[in-house]
Amino acid sequence: MKNKIKSTALATLLTGTALLTGTLPTGSEAAESPFAVAMEKMEIDGLNIAYREAGDPDNPTVLLLHGFPTSSHMFRELIPELAAKYHVIAPDYPGFGASDMPDAASYDYSFANAADIVTQLIDAKDVDDYAVYLMDYGAPVGYRMFAEHPERVTGFIIQNGNAYEEGLRDFWDPI
C-alpha cells in the first residue's frame, strides 16, 4: 500500500511539474498533433465561447453538439479517436462548460442564439461544410443551423435528438 501511495504521489508530482514547466503541449501546440485536443476560447458577440478542437483542418469537419446539461467535456474521449481522420470541433454553448454565462435578464438563452453562436464559430474557423453529431439539446441547435444553411451540412449523426415544431422554418413543410 505504501508503494502505491508513493507511486501515485510521484506520478502527480511529475505531471504537475510538466504542466508548470510547459513540457506538455497546450493551445496551438496541442492542435498540431492530430490526436491532441486543444481547449480554446473565441470572443463571439461579446462572449467568450469555449470549444475543443483536434485533427487536421484539411480533413472533413465533424461538429459535435452537446446536450443538456453537459458541455464539450462529454466528448473528451471521442474527439481524439475522430481526430485521426477528421477535423473535430466541439463548442460549449453560452452558459455551458467553459463558455461565458451571461445574465439571463440580458441574454436570450434560445436554440436560435446557440445556433447563431456556433455558426459564427465555424465561420471564424473557415469551415465551409461539416457533418454534425447532435443529441438532446444539440438537436434543435443543429437543425436550426441546417435550416439556415442546408448546403453546408454533409451529414447528420443523431442520438436521442428532439425535433420541436417551434422555430422550424418553411423549409420543412414538404416533409
Tell me what each language-model feature is.
Residues E40, L64, I89-A90, Y133, ...:
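Conserved Rossmann-like nucleotide-binding pocket used by diverse enzymes
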Residues D100-D103, G167-W172:
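Short aromatic-enriched loop/helix-cap "lid" or pocket-rim segments at secondary-structure transitions
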Residues I44-D45, R52-A54, A90-M135:
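Active-site loop/oxyanion-hole signature of alpha/beta-hydrolase fold enzymes
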Residues L47, E53-M101:
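Conserved HGGG/HGGXW glycine-rich cap/lid loop of the alpha/beta-hydrolase fold
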Residues K85, V127-R169:
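Conserved hydrolase catalytic core segment
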Residues K2-T61, A84-Y86, V127-D128:
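Alpha/beta-hydrolase fold catalytic core
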Residues A30, F171-I175:
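Short, intrinsically disordered, charge-balanced linker/junction segments flanking boundaries
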